[in-house]
Amino acid sequence: MIKTILVVCIGNICRSPMAQALLRQALPGVSVISAGIGALSGYPADPSAVEVMAQHGIDISEHRAQQLTGSLVNRADLILVMGGAQKREIQARHPSKTGSVFRLGEMEQFDIDDPYRKQMMAFEDALAMIQRGVDAWVPRIRALG
């Protein structure tokens, strides 16, 4: 049974907060948290991420970045990352969690590009890819319990 999902990106201000919000919406009984491998703790979500999510009726304006820690990793039943490099880094740092770390795009074999400091179109593209990943994961997570 998956009780806690940890979503990870680099800064925890663009992709992972968007994925966290979508997963929370789709899986109300599951605790979904997010963190960044290189996050500046306390920073708000990127204004473009807030805007693109608001266009889809989801408010992430209260999000604050947090640094990925061993405690967060150990607490998670499933860790979803945006790309292969993040997956490898977490697996190397936390070998006991290797079997719990997957890309959000694992099923369709895609990574989600970082839209940070890019045009709004990059955020829209990232959100579309995140939604594809969430849509692929949600039935599998529900099937586990």
From Swiss-Prot:
Pathway: Glycan metabolism; exopolysaccharide biosynthesis
Pfam assignment, any one: LMWPc
Tree of life domain: Bacteria
Residues forming coiled coils: none
Alphabetized Gene3D superfamilies for the sequence: 3.40.50.2300
Molecular function per GO: protein tyrosine phosphatase activity
Recorded catalytic activity of this chain's protein: O-phospho-L-tyrosyl-[protein] + H2O = L-tyrosyl-[protein] + phosphate
Broad enzyme group: hydrolase
Function: May be involved in assembly or function of the EPS I polymerization/export complex and/or the EpsB ATPase. Alternatively it may function in the removal of the terminal phosphate from C55-isoprenyl pyrophosphate in order to recycle the C55-isoprenyl phosphate lipid carrier used in the synthesis of polysaccharide repeat units.
PANTHER family: LOW MOLECULAR WEIGHT PROTEIN TYROSINE PHOSPHATASE, LOW MOLECULAR WEIGHT PROTEIN-TYROSINE-PHOSPHATASE ETP-RELATED
Protein name: Probable low molecular weight protein-tyrosine-phosphatase EpsP
Organism: Ralstonia solanacearum (Pseudomonas solanacearum)
Lineage summary: Bacteria, Pseudomonadati, Pseudomonadota, Betaproteobacteria, Burkholderiales
